[in-house]
Structures are given as structure tokens and as C-alpha cells.
Amino acid sequence: MAKSKDARVAVILECTSCIRNSVNKVLTGISRYITQKNRRNTPNRLELRKFCPYCYKHMIHGEIKK
């Protein structure tokens, strides 16, 4: 029998710096990325270092609830 495919889910990553420092910016907005994670291997929240076009640098993007 084949294994079920519900271990891999789509998650949304959001810039943690844009949420905290939304004041005094040239561009206003929040950077978001869509990726996948395996729930069996990473049961806790995912955090990746990605480029934020609003902060103009690489920042930590954390998983948010849908």
C-alpha cells in the first residue's frame, strides 16, 4: 500500500522585521513566501532566512497560521 501524502503541507513565511518595524520605511508592506514542509520531520514552526524586498536585506521569515 502507498503511504498517505498528508505529511507535506504548504506553509506561508512572513518577514518578522516588517511586522515589528512598519514605521519610517520607503515602501510599506510585508514580505511573504510560500513553501512546503514535511510535518513528520519538522513538527514545530519553520523559520528561514530569506530576502525581504521591503527591508532591502536578508531577514528571518517565520511560519504563520493560515
UniProtKB/Swiss-Prot annotation:
Assigned GO CC terms: plastid; ribonucleoprotein complex; ribosome
GO MF term list: structural constituent of ribosome
Any one GO BP annotation for this protein: translation
Subcellular location: Plastid
PROSITE patterns reported for this sequence: RIBOSOMAL_L33
UniProtKB keywords: Plastid, Ribonucleoprotein, Ribosomal protein
Family of the protein in this entry: Belongs to the bacterial ribosomal protein bL33 family.
UniProt-recorded name of the protein: Large ribosomal subunit protein bL33c
Chain's gene name: rpl33
